[in-house]
């Protein structure tokens, strides 16, 4: 009788288990087909991590944990049918919640994401991974915490089956509410709201996200064209060339009729001096582009860059004339002023300064009017040996079109005008511009700036300010012999003979063949009463080719 009761109890348990297995809602079973395994690899091809995840649409969009991607160079998934697919890009990630959204290269079975969360005490279903029949486990939601006002963070206290990290949890309708995360500190299991991960998007600046930068898998290209171009630009500036090439390919897949991706490929080819490949890329861009003006303009920029920075490497198919021709084609297709701006820059580079000046000035009467045009016109006038006052007037115009109050945008134009005023002998006015530049760029100067301003201050007889600046220059660039020699020269003017001698000796310690430093040391020694040693140093300066030395030797001997 006892045996019968035990057998009966066991039979009831088996029947109950069978009932639970068969009682699972059909949408839950369907959702199990969207589960996959995720495997990530290091740059050397070795295994980094294994996990799971779930597809949330039919186009390969998936969610899983972020930690599997941290430090990964590549990743693959295997779906519930055994099909392997590559992870092409990351859409978003959050290190704190350890979640990531990404895309694979294929069509996929999917489970929809729940738009509303579950309450405490509700039942969820944990979907395991299997090629044939997935294990499905009921899970009680023990606690729900809210974050960011609208998302749920679930806590599940019951023990879960092994090898279910990042497997999805769904509601009775088969909608994904989150995926399983084991606690590092307790026996609890957690799940971050799948809606939070699903709503992640990319922008042009996503590639600069410090979390996403830790993976070699590229960031997804935004749907917005301008944001996509920004993402492409940032990728092109990055140090990871392999990751950048992946971003370029993603951009070209999403925007095949835009020239930007081809331009970056062409630019990379040009950097490697493969001008044939660069040319082919741009010819392809022109053929495919719907906006022909943009494609021709991009090609013109590329040729111009080559002719400016790599003119020593011959490539007969390209020339400044070819660059001008492509810019002209762009303008004919769409008469935009900045296409003519490039033409003006090309004319300047060709030393056709009058034509360049005329075009720069014509552009100041368009909606492109900006300080750069007046500055470039001033440079053209300078090359034409125009009166100094005409050049200054153009630089004044550059300053006048800048927005007020001045920002760092004004910095290059202030420096240009300061140098022009200095060249004209208007030292106090020049110093005023140097000072305004100093105020705008506070904390971002280099030693060269303080040296330049010191030179102007000496000419303007502002010796104390000059001494302050040359001291700053020597502190910022202590290994530059020129600055110590200049300091020595200024100290001699101020009759600070011993300090001048020490500065000259510092300069010589950095460059033992610096004739100017020998000259200054010699003068300082003579003024300190050491005529013999001083003359020897003047003679050394003469031997090194210093042109001032002979007259000083004659003066002091």
Set out the residue ranges of the language-model regions.
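Conserved active-site neighborhood of the chymotrypsin/trypsin-like protease fold
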Residues: 57-127, 132-136, 150-153
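Helix-start (N-cap) detector for alpha-helical repeat units in TPR-like alpha-solenoids
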Residues: 259-260, 291-297, 335-340, 370-372, ...
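C-terminal cap/linker of serine protease catalytic domains
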Residues: 25-28, 178-243
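Canonical tetratricopeptide repeat
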Residues: 264, 298, 342, 376, ...
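Register position in tetratricopeptide repeats
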Residues: 271, 305-309, 349, 383-384, ...
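A conserved glycine-rich beta-strand in the N-terminal activation segment of trypsin-fold
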Residues: 24, 41-65, 84-86, 166-167
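Single-residue signature of alpha-solenoid repeat helices
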Residues: 244, 278, 323, 356, ...
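Flexible, gly/ser-rich surface segments that form the specificity/activation loops bordering the active-site cleft
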Residues: 24-27, 109-153, 160-164, 180-191
């Amino acid at each position: 009788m006892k045996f019968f009761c035990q057998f009966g109890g066991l039979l009831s348990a088996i029947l109950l288990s069978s009932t639970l297995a068969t009682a699972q809602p059909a949408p839950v079973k369907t959702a199990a087909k969207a589960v996959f395994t995720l495997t990530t690899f290091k740059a050397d091809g070795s295994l980094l991590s294994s996990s799971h995840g779930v597809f949330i649409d039919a186009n390969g969009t998936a969610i899983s944990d972020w930690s599997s991607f941290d430090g990964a160079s590549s990743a693959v998934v295997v779906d519930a049918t055994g099909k392997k697919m590559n992870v092409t890009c990351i859409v978003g990630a959050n290190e704190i919640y350890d979640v990531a959204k990404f895309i694979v290269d294929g069509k996929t079975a999917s489970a929809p994401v729940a738009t509303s969360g579950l309450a405490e005490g509700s039942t969820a279903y944990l979907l395991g991974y299997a090629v044939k029949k997935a294990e499905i486990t009921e899970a009680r939601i023990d606690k729900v915490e809210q974050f960011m006002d609208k998302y749920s963070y679930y806590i599940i206290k019951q023990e879960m089956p092994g090898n279910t990290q990042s497997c999805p949890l769904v509601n009775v309708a088969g909608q994904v509410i989150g995926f399983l995360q084991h606690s590092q500190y307790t026996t609890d299991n957690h799940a971050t709201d799948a809606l939070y991960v699903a709503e992640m998007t990319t922008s042009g600046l996503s590639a600069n996200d410090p979390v996403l930068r830790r993976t070699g898998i590229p960031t997804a290209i935004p749907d917005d064209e301008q944001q996509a171009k920004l993402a492409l630009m940032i990728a092109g500036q990055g140090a990871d060339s392999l990751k950048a090439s992946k971003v370029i390919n993603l951009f070209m897949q999403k925007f095949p009729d835009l020239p930007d991706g081809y331009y970056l490929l062409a630019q990379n080819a040009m950097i490697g001096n493969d001008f044939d490949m660069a040319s082919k890329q741009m010819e392809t861009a022109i053929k495919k582009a719907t906006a022909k003006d943009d494609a021709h303009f991009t090609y013109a920029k590329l040729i111009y860059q080559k002719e400016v920075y790599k003119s020593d490497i011959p490539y007969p198919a390209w020339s400044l004339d070819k660059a001008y021709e492509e810019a002209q084609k762009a303008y004919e297709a769409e008469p935009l002023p900045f296409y003519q701006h490039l033409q003006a820059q090309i004319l300047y580079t060709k030393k056709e300064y009058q034509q360049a000046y005329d075009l720069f000035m014509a552009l100041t009467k368009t909606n492109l009017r900006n300080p750069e045009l007046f500055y470039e016109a001033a440079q053209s006038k300078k090359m034409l040996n125009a009166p100094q006052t005409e050049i200054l007037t153009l630089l004044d115009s550059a300053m006048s079109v800048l927005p007020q109050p001045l920002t760092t945008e004004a910095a290059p134009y202030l420096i240009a005008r300061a140098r022009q005023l200095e060249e004209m002998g208007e030292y106090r006015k020049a110093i005023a511009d140097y000072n305004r530049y100093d105020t705008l760029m506070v904390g971002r100067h280099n030693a060269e700036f303080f040296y330049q301003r010191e030179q102007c201050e000496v000419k303007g007889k502002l010796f104390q300010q000059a001494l302050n600046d040359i001291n700053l220059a020597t502190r910022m660039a202590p290994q530059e012999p020129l600055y110590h020699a200049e300091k020595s020269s200024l100290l001699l003017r101020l009759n600070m003979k011993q300090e001048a001698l020490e500065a000259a000796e510092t300069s010589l310690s950095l460059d033992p063949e610096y004739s100017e430093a020998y000259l200054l040391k010699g003068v300082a020694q003579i003024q300190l009463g050491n005529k013999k040693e001083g003359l020897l140093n003047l003679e050394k300066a003469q031997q090194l080719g210093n042109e001032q030395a002979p007259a000083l030797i004659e003066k002091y001997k």
